[in-house]
Amino acid sequence: MNLYSVARVISLSVLCAGFAFSQAAAGDLPQVGQEAPAVTLPSQDGSQVSLKEFRGKWVVLYFYPKDNTPGCTIEAHNFQRDLSKYQDKNAVILGVSVDSTESHQDFCTKQGLTFKLLADTEKKVVAEYGSLSDRGFASRNTFLIDPEGKIVKVWTGVKPSEHSEEVLAALSELQKN
């Protein structure tokens, strides 16, 4: 086997391993129709917030990488901009990252955010939702949870500038049925 063939075999092996790893990670996402995994985490004001508190409401549970970064700020601003539309649809927004409550408080103050941001510093909830990146941050994924606590829609790798509108459209469509 010549050097070119060896390099080619190694390259293909690495590609296949990477693909298999990414598929395994994607398989860890809770699926549509599943009961949403339990969430109890501290928010920016230090209070404990539990997903079960919101039974009877729609929940937009969105995971994002880091406070005060460009994409995360755009996404948060858009959710804040549309907050009254979500409230009109009996929906709450909960953001989750691995940042601390202090970081969330600073982010909310600087950006004028009034919805809850939850601090998963131990990365347990982020991992349970299949949203822990290999760099230790939350991946940009969102779960729409119905009033009975079931996951009805999942978005992965979202575009921050368009995402709130996508979620609102899906929520409107689901509420028609």
Language model: regions and residue ranges:
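N-proximal helix/coil linker or "cap" segments that precede and/or mark the start of modular domains
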Residues: 3-6, 10-38
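Short active-site neighborhood of thiol/selenol oxidoreductases, capturing the structured segment around
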Residues: 51-73
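A short beta-strand-turn-helix
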Residues: 30-33, 39-59
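Structural micro-motif
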Residues: 113-115, 133-143
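Thiol-/selenol-based redox modules, centered on thioredoxin-like
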Residues: 138-177
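Structural microenvironment flanking redox-active thiols in thiol-disulfide oxidoreductases
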Residues: 71-111, 122-127
